[in-house]
């Protein structure tokens, strides 16, 4: 680890992030193999349609557990918009779509990241509930079960659309930020540029962990 890097995530956060991401990706692939004839070849890779459905269903359970834990873990920081700062950031589009002299400062997660989190949370819950009903279709009237398929697809479309934006902004769009979910550490310069308010708050509270530096004392003199 390089000197001057800041710890932004712990191992628990990273494990849950990748459990959710990989299970979601596998659900997308297996789901496409079941929904569209064009992607029937995916079923062959898993040993047939029956095996594909089993993989999809049990991956859904992993996704459900991961999502519940992720919502519980990140809701306070990523699930609530803070006004007026988040609105100011949105009005400036975070500086991504046009030039702004100064991007409004936000907390650990900006409104774009919060929006993605809420879409994944809402779309994920929708897919879990509809998926369970589709798994056990005899539990409800046929007319109601039929509605589960388009609703399930709606959750997929919402998450999949935001996924590519998240992937771009987490890699090419913000070089260096991918380290947060790989090693748990980010270059302090990059972090300060992307989340200056959070860095200031953590420094003020004495909670900022910088590799190669001793933890600073907080305002009350505790380390």
Predicted features along the sequence, with ranges:
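Membrane-embedded alpha-helical bundles that constitute the cytochrome b-like, heme-associated redox core
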Residues: 1-223
């Amino acid at each position: 680890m390089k000197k001057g890097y800041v710890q932004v995530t712990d191992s628990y956060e990273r494990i849950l992030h990748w459990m959710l991401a990989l299970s979601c990706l596998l659900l997308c692939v297996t789901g496409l193999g079941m929904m569209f004839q064009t992607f029937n070849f995916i079923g062959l890779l898993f040993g047939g349609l029956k095996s594909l459905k089993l993989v999809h269903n049990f991956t859904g359970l992993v996704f459900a557990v991961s999502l519940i834990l992720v919502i519980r873990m990140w809701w306070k920081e990523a699930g609530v918009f803070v006004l007026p700062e988040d609105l100011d950031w949105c009005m400036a589009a975070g500086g991504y779509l046009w030039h702004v002299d100064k991007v409004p400062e936000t907390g650990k997660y900006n409104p774009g990241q919060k929006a993605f989190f809420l879409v994944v949370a809402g779309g994920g819950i929708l897919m879990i509930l509809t998926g369970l009903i589709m798994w056990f279709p005899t539990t409800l009237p046929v007319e109601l079960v039929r509605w589960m398929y388009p609703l399930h697809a709606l959750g997929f479309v919402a998450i999949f659309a935001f996924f590519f934006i998240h992937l771009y902004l987490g890699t090419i769009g913000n070089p260096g930020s991918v380290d947060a979910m790989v090693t748990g550490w980010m270059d302090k310069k990059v972090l300060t540029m992307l989340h200056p308010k959070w860095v200031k708050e953590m420094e003020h509270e004495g909670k900022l962990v910088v590799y190669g530096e001793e933890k600073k004392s907080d305002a009350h003199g505790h380390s």
